[in-house]
Amino acid sequence: MSLKDRFDRFIDYFTEDEDSSLPYEKRDEPVFTPVNSSQEPALPMNQPSQSVGTKENNITRLHARQQELANQSQRATDKVIIDVRYPRKYEDATEIVDLLAGNESILIDFQYMTEVQARRCLDYLDGACHVLAGNLKKVASTMYLLTPVNVIVNVEDIRLPDEDQQGEFGFDMKRNRVR
């Protein structure tokens, strides 16, 4: 062999990624056998675990959690606790949503917030209420009752003395209609 042939083979050794002359080797794949209901299926160690972050799975887990909380609260109906919150800034809304996610009822009084901040906070709470299947009811001019899915609220339809708005939420933007 000449020096040039050796040099070419040396270069080919490092430049080729795949040798097409070798036959394809099939890897051993794990074989799953039927498992009794009392046993848990064992995952093979060589397969990477797949994280399932799909929207449907999250919704299913959320619905299951809500059902679990509803069943749990039906069993323990000794006392009902309603937390009263006076948010002073928009960032306090996340704490209120955490309480709702923990299956607690919250009475919210927006008297220490400006109207713009209260409207923004109320929009956030309303969105969280829909996601967690809760209820948001206006009980006074600046007070709202936020309850989880398993709590039923019966509010008498009364008119407050200073209430001139027709909507359910007092912090909605007022629009002047031109006729």
Curated annotation (Swiss-Prot):
Keywords assigned: Cell cycle, Cell division, Cytoplasm, Septation
Biased composition (Polar residues): 34-53
Region (Disordered): 22-53
One Pfam family linked to the record: SepF
UniProt-listed GO biological process terms: division septum assembly; FtsZ-dependent cytokinesis
Its biological purpose: Cell division protein that is part of the divisome complex and is recruited early to the Z-ring. Probably stimulates Z-ring formation, perhaps through the cross-linking of FtsZ protofilaments. Its function overlaps with FtsA.
PANTHER family: CELL DIVISION PROTEIN SEPF
GO cellular component: cytoplasm
Subunit comment: Homodimer. Interacts with FtsZ.
Subcellular location: Cytoplasm
Predominant location: cytoplasm
This protein's name: Cell division protein SepF
Family the UniProt entry places it in: Belongs to the SepF family.
